[in-house]
Regions:
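A glycine- and charged-residue-rich anion-binding loop/surface
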Residues: 1-428
Length: 428
């Protein structure tokens, strides 16, 4: 079996290339990452990077360049390397999925270059940050993932982020220092190179690595800043990254997880934050620099409004309880329909009314849906067991609920008229 030539190691900036097909397989189902795939194709050469090293695979297109099916285009939706074989998973019409694809045929391939380049920017940025953290604080990078996607299908605007984990915790001030140094490395336009040292040479080199590797080790070197074992494509110069921004952190397995965006992802994120700032500024009717003070004022006003609302709800609940108690007579049910108060206030009404209602049943229906065909209820009584009544109520009014002998609660799927009719029949 001839191995696929890995163009992404020869030049990470190759975004389109011709290739010859070496094998085609029709799939009964696609891989986990790309269930829509129905074909797996091997090429004599490829610039599509397969998933690995914490980075998702490249995607793009594969176009037939000759024969009866010349010009037919397939979507490359996933790329995986298994047992030394690089499989390109394609999406196509299953009725004629493999037509035009056969060993020996030539295809023209193109990467989703903007997505690939964003991954390169962010992966190299991760090496820069990890190298600085390792040098300054001695912590190891123990986990890494980068993912880049389009916001919407066909949209040129990219989103995504990098997460990476360190073996120790970092303070906010330390992270700010790391970010400043990382962006200084970007501005320094350091050369980024990759090599495969011989095993005997590797023994004498100092480099970062998550695994104990002894052969086919690819080292990515960033100026005099960092050397790390890595299988992924990188930018050729740190200046290609543009900017590195550490967004937030969280404690993770005794260390810290960092969320980062670099390059075009950071640029898009900055644009989003500017738009959000402008939106909040308009909402608060204040310039951006006054947003913190505006939010403080809004919070204070909301707190005052909440206090007033609580006081008004209490007063309204007390008034409703008095009304309900007055309507309870001759053992007939006292029923109230309430659309303003919530569950806590309704329970308060029932609890306050039951002692004054004597043998009468006290029922409050509240929180109706938009068309008034469903209600919640709380029903209490100082005499008898309400649980058999709950079954009768639920059966008659398409309800659900239950509770204790002295109080039941639940929902009914009925209108106010239907509920009133039920209680009229109940009282005779």
């Amino acid at each position: 079996m001839t191995k696929t030539r890995k163009l992404y190691y020869e030049d990470a900036h190759i975004c389109a290339f011709p290739a010859d097909i070496t094998a085609v397989a029709v799939l009964s189902e696609g891989p986990e990452n790309a269930p829509e795939a129905c074909l797996a194709v091997e090429l004599d050469r490829t610039a599509f990077f397969p998933e690995g090293g914490g980075q998702t695979s490249d995607t793009g297109t594969m176009k037939i360049t000759g024969g009866a099916y010349r010009g037919r285009v397939f979507r490359v939706v996933d790329v995986q390397e298994t047992d030394g074989r690089i499989l390109h998973y394609l999406a196509a019409d299953e009725k004629d999925a493999a037509k035009g694809l056969a060993a020996g045929n030539r295809v023209s391939c193109a990467l989703d270059w903007d997505v690939r380049f964003a991954k390169m920017q962010n992966h190299t940025a991760e090496h820069i940050v990890s190298g600085i953290v390792h040098t300054k604080y001695g912590f190891e990078n123990v986990g890494f993932h980068v993912s880049v996607t389009r916001r919407d299908s066909g949209d040129a605007d990219l989103t995504g982020e990098v997460t990476f984990d360190f073996s120790g915790e970092l303070t906010a001030e330390q992270l700010r220092a790391v970010e400043r140094e990382a962006n200084a490395a970007v501005r320094a336009a350091m050369r980024v190179t990759a090599s495969f040292p011989a095993p005997e040479e590797l023994q004498n080199l100092t480099y970062r690595s998550k695994l104990e590797l002894t052969e086919n080790v690819r080292l990515v070197t960033i100026g005099d800043l960092d050397v790390c074992a890595c299988c992924a494509p990188h930018v050729a110069n740190t200046a290609e990254i543009g900017i590195i921004k550490l967004l937030r952190t969280e404690r993770y397995k005794g260390g810290v997880r960092i969320h980062m965006k670099a390059g075009v992802l950071a640029q898009n994120d900055y644009g989003d934050r500017i738009a959000l700032t402008e939106l909040v500024s308009r909402f608060l009717s204040c310039p951006a620099e006054d947003i913190p003070a505006g939010l403080e004022q809004l919070k204070a006003a909301d707190d005052r409004a909440h206090e007033r609302r609580v006081a008004l709800e209490k007063a309204l609940a007390d008034a409703r309880a008095l009304f309900l108690a007055a309507s309870a007579e001759d053992g007939r049910p006292a029923v109230l329909f309430e659309s303003l108060l919530g569950e806590d206030a309704v329970r308060r009404i029932v609890n306050e009314t039951v002692p004054a209602a004597g043998a009468s049943l006290v029922a409050v229906f509240f929180a109706p849906n938009e068309d008034g065909t469903a209600w919640r209820y709380v029903i209490g009584s100082a005499s008898g067991d309400l649980r058999p009544f709950a079954k009768e109520l639920n059966a008659a009014l398409s309800g659900r609920g239950g509770g204790s002998p002295g109080m039941i609660q639940g929902t009914v799927g009925a209108s106010q008229d239907a509920i009133e009719s039920f209680f009229c029949r109940l009282s005779g």
